[in-house]
């Protein structure tokens, strides 16, 4: 909830709170059985937001963020919903499509349906089990996406990504001294 909601263009909501409330309201109205899985790497402040959601929607079913995507798929998950998260290609690799609502890194791939308006997003949510592709094709596209997004680009790009990931983990999980030492490496 404290991430940058407009890091990608065309997010059809002003912020993540509006997105999650619209999503929950639409799924409830359509009678769709769903669960909320908090982001596994969310910052501690987001726990407060989850508690606010539980107060607003007492019937809400929240699962542990420790549940893996593999466990969800093995349990019968038919669709994932994310504003623009990596879960879209992670689920696609396991044969599960997703619904997104911003121009995100996956938008050129057919393993996720990307809504361009609130009405289109609501329609997608009313039919979450719709699949345009076979599991094999979704898996192929997920691998193509992963290569283009994470591997293609050379050693310098990969090293920068790894350094940023280390910084992010320290910024959210450590004491200031370790973070300062890690930041010095960016000089």
Each model region followed by its residue ranges:
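Nucleotide-activated donor-binding/catalytic signature segment of Leloir-type glycosyltransferases, i.e.
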Residues: 50-64
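C-terminal amphipathic helix plus adjacent low-complexity
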Residues: 118-187
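Flexible loop/turn segments at secondary-structure boundaries
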Residues: 1-6, 41-48, 69-72, 88-90, ...
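Conserved catalytic-core segment of nucleotide-activated headgroup transferases in glycan assembly
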Residues: 1-52
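Short acidic-hydrophobic, aromatic-tinged amphipathic segments that line or gate anion-handling sites
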Residues: 61-65, 112-124
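A donor-sugar binding/catalytic signature common to diverse glycosyltransferases
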Residues: 66-113
């Amino acid at each position: 909830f404290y991430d940058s909601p407009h890091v990608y263009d065309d997010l059809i909501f002003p912020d993540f709170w509006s997105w999650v409330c619209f999503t929950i309201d639409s799924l409830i109205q359509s009678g769709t059985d769903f669960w909320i899985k908090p982001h596994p790497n969310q910052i501690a402040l987001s726990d407060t937001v989850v508690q606010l959601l539980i107060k607003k929607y007492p019937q809400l079913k929240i699962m542990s963020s420790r549940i893996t995507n593999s466990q969800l798929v093995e349990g019968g998950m038919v669709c994932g919903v994310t504003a623009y998260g990596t879960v879209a290609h992670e689920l696609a690799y396991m044969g599960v499509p997703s619904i997104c609502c911003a121009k995100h890194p996956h938008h050129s791939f057919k393993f996720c349906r990307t809504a361009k308006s609130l009405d289109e997003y609501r329609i997608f949510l009313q039919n979450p089990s719709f699949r345009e592709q076979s599991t094999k094709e979704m898996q192929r596209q997920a691998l193509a996406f992963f290569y283009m997004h994470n591997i293609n680009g050379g050693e310098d790009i990969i090293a920068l990504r790894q350094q940023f990931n280390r910084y992010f983990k320290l910024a959210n999980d450590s004491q200031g001294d370790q973070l300062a030492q890690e930041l010095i490496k960016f000089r």
